Curated annotation (Swiss-Prot):
The gene is ACYP1. This is Acylphosphatase-1. It holds the Pfam family Acylphosphatase. The modification N-acetylalanine is found at residue 2. Coiled coil: none annotated. GO terms for molecular function: acylphosphatase activity. It comes from the Eukaryota. It catalyses: an acyl phosphate + H2O = a carboxylate + phosphate + H(+). InterPro entries: Acylphosphatase, Acylphosphatase-like_dom, Acylphosphatase-like_dom_sf, Acylphosphatase_CS.
Length: 99
């Protein structure tokens, strides 16, 4: 899947107006378009968090999307990325919305 490019994993948390604006659905669609796996969910403190895995360049594309674009009605104030690392194999089989 990755060719000569390594796989990477990153955890993310996005703050701002990101709940009640279909942010999870749009994140799932964008991740699938990029061929990534992982998950996304709302938190009890009004943010959206998740994990994305796949070819490094594609994960970086999703990071930019999470920082600057999001869903049409969202207003992103901050996107934080943690636990960014190279991985030997994907740990998920799909990109899911978690409740």
């Amino acid at each position: 899947m990755a060719g000569s490019e390594g796989l990477m994993s990153v955890d993310y948390e996005v703050s701002g107006r990101v709940q009640g604006v279909f942010f999870r659905k749009y994140t799932q669609s964008e991740a699938k378009r990029l061929g990534l796996v992982g998950w996304v969910r709302n938190t009890s403190h009004g943010t959206v968090q998740g994990q994305a895995q796949g070819p490094a360049a594609r994960v970086r594309e999703l990071q930019e999307w999470l920082r600057k674009i999001g869903s049409p009605q969202s207003r992103i104030s901050r996107a934080e990325f943690t636990n960014e690392k190279e991985i030997a194999a994907l740990e998920h089989t799909d990109f899911q919305i978690r409740k």
